[in-house]
């Protein structure tokens, strides 16, 4: 039996970073509350094959999926809002599309045809979208088109999606256009002209939006909605206002109050019983809005100027705080600078996130030393764990201990590149990526947090604790609390006689959800709360 999905395509206009990803994720959350199965796709119109080699300052965090793909951070939003694990193929890039088409041409699949944008590229885009829809078995497929309408890079994707609507039927595909309605304080009024022009640009591609979601700093009134409906040729009830919210998790509630779910259900003829029920989600949002007690976490990182570089860590801390019914305040501390001990002393806890390269390592090591000497709860993730091992070794007689990533000639290479990684020359998609199992040692902080002996966590690294120094480090007091099931790779470390000192080689933040806070983050914040008291 052929799987027939309904498609909701989300495009953006006027400005970039308008919140298309949160909008798409919020629509998905609303549809989930009807009892519908939903999956999501992010289209990134850049020529990179994936997000793995992109600069965090330009693109934000690289989100790693269970199956080991390095993807756009919007997939993290989708997973958190939909509470489901997405495949890496749900991130479609121009690079993937072109590579697939060129490989097919080289293998003779096109039988000598002149390979063109239309039909070959557009057919490949549609094929990728349908493949994801079929494999997921979802009733609704959300497709977010990255960038802004009018970008030259996005034109083949918009054409493919226009064709998709014709082929699937207008009752099975709808377009949601997210725009910005600026407020001019000098004139004291909102301006709809940018939205009108953006919609006109979209219509010039052959796509008429079914719904327009207007982002704004403040709520807009019904007369403005009528004006936009009139000039943009959509129904008045399909003009939706999404003003700035205090939390991204409020957006599904805002859109639901605008009857977005009801309109979508009617527009693409979804088979549902009853109304959307977001009561559980509203409870989560209420927990996220708690004002006190407050715990302070200092994140010592090298990309702190752009918070999106650590977006999953930030959200995981919020989820854990909501679980404990506390508020978390995050202090962003640049590891590039000499870490000020006075600043650190005001913190309830310290978190050292992942990263690559030598820049900022000295600052991270200073933070580890401060946490050890002052008994401050500290959580190290990926490179953060490696820094904890390095500083622990140095403080316990292994002078000059380091990672071979930073000092190939170190006398104590306590962190070294994994053996199988040493033969790899290409950078893209070649690390230890995706979900791997970790066996947890009983009687440890990790076991207390997880409450189980075997867990699956997502990884993204080339370097590991060097087994040649494992026995020596353990003799000095380092506890290996988690390893690969074969006991070969060290996954987690702790020490005794410290309130909370734990490092993990994996990225637990990728598994945290608003309704299911990650146990390590909950345990970490609980220790921070104890210190704050």
Curated annotation (Swiss-Prot):
What is an example of a GO molecular function annotated in this UniProt entry?
A: CTP synthase activity
Per the UniProt entry, what are the Gene Ontology biological process annotations, in alphabetical order?
A: 'de novo' CTP biosynthetic process; pyrimidine nucleobase biosynthetic process
Q: EC number(s) of the enzyme?
A: 6.3.4.2
What residues bind UTP, as annotated? 16, 191-196, 227
Residues binding CTP, per UniProt: 16, 151-153, 191-196, 227
Reaction catalysis annotation: UTP + L-glutamine + ATP + H2O = CTP + L-glutamate + ADP + phosphate + 2 H(+); L-glutamine + H2O = L-glutamate + NH4(+); UTP + NH4(+) + ATP = CTP + ADP + phosphate + 2 H(+)
Annotated disulfide bonds = none
Question: Which Pfam families does the record associate with it?
Answer: CTP_synth_N, GATase
- Catalytic residue positions: 382, 507, 509
Functionally, this protein is described as follows:
Catalyzes the ATP-dependent amination of UTP to CTP with either L-glutamine or ammonia as the source of nitrogen. Regulates intracellular CTP levels through interactions with the four ribonucleotide triphosphates.
Task: Note the HAMAP family from the entry.
Answer: PyrG
Query: What name does the UniProt record give this protein?
Result: CTP synthase
**Species, as recorded:** Methanothermobacter thermautotrophicus (strain ATCC 29096 / DSM 1053 / JCM 10044 / NBRC 100330 / Delta H) (Methanobacterium thermoautotrophicum)
- The UniProt gene name for this protein comes to pyrG
């Amino acid at each position: 039996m052929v799987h027939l999905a309904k498609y909701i395509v989300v495009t953006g206009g006027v400005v970039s970073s308008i919140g298309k990803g949160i909008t798409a994720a919020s629509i998905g959350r609303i549809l989930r509350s009807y009892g519908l199965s939903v999956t999501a796709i992010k289209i990134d119109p850049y020529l990179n094959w994936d997000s793995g080699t992109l600069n965090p300052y330009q693109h934000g965090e690289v989100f790693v999926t269970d199956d080991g793909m390095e993807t756009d951070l919007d997939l993290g939003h989708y997973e958190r809002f939909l509470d489901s694990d997405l495949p890496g193929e749900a991130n479609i890039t121009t690079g993937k599309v072109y590579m697939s088409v060129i490989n097919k041409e080289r293998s003779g699949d096109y039988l000598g045809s002149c390979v063109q944008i239309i039909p070959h590229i557009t057919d490949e885009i549609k094929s990728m979208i349908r493949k994801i829809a079929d494999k997921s078995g979802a009733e609704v497929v959300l497709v977010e088109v990255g960038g802004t309408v009018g970008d030259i890079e996005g034109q083949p994707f918009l054409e493919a999606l226009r064709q998709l609507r014709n082929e699937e039927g207008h009752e099975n595909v709808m377009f949601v256009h997210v725009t910005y309605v600026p407020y001019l304080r000098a004139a004291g009024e909102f301006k709809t002209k940018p939205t009108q022009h953006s919609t006109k640009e979209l219509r010039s591609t052959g796509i008429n939006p079914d719904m327009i979601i207007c982002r704004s700093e403040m709520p807009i009134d019904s007369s403005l909605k009528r004006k936009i409906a009139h000039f943009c040729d959509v129904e008045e009830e399909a003009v939706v206002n999404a003003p700035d919210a205090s939390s991204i998790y409020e957006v599904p509630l805002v859109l639901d109050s605008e009857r977005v779910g009801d309109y979508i259900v009617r527009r693409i003829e979804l088979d549902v019983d009853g109304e959307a029920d977001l009561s559980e989600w509203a409870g989560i949002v209420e927990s996220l809005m708690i004002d006190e007690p407050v715990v302070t976490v200092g994140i010592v990182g090298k990309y702190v100027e752009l918070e999106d570089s650590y977006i999953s860590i930030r959200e995981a801390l919020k989820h854990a705080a909501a679980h404990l019914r506390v508020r978390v305040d995050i202090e962003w501390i640049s590891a590039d600078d000499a870490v000020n001990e006075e600043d650190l002393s005001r913190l309830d806890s310290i978190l050292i996130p992942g990263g690559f390269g030598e820049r900022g390592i000295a600052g991270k090591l200073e933070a580890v030393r401060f946490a050890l000497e002052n008994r401050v709860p500290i959580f190290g993730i990926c490179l953060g764990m490696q820094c904890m091992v390095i500083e622990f070794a140095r403080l316990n007689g292994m002078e000059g201990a380091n990672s071979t990533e930073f000092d190939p000639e170190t006398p104590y290479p306590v962190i070294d590149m994994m053996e199988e990684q040493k033969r790899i020359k290409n950078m893209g998609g070649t690390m230890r990526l995706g979900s791997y199992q970790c066996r947890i040692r009983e009687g440890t902080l990790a076991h207390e947090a997880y409450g189980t002996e075997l867990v699956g966590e997502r990884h993204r690294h080339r370097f590991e604790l060097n087994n040649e120094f494992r026995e020596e480090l353990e003799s000095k007091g380092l506890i290996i609390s988690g390893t690969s099931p074969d006991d070969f790779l060290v996954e987690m470390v702790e020490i005794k006689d410290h309130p909370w000192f734990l490092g993990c080689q994996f990225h637990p933040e990728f598994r945290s959800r608003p309704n299911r806070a990650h146990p390590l983050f909950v345990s970490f914040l609980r220790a921070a709360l104890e210190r704050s008291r």
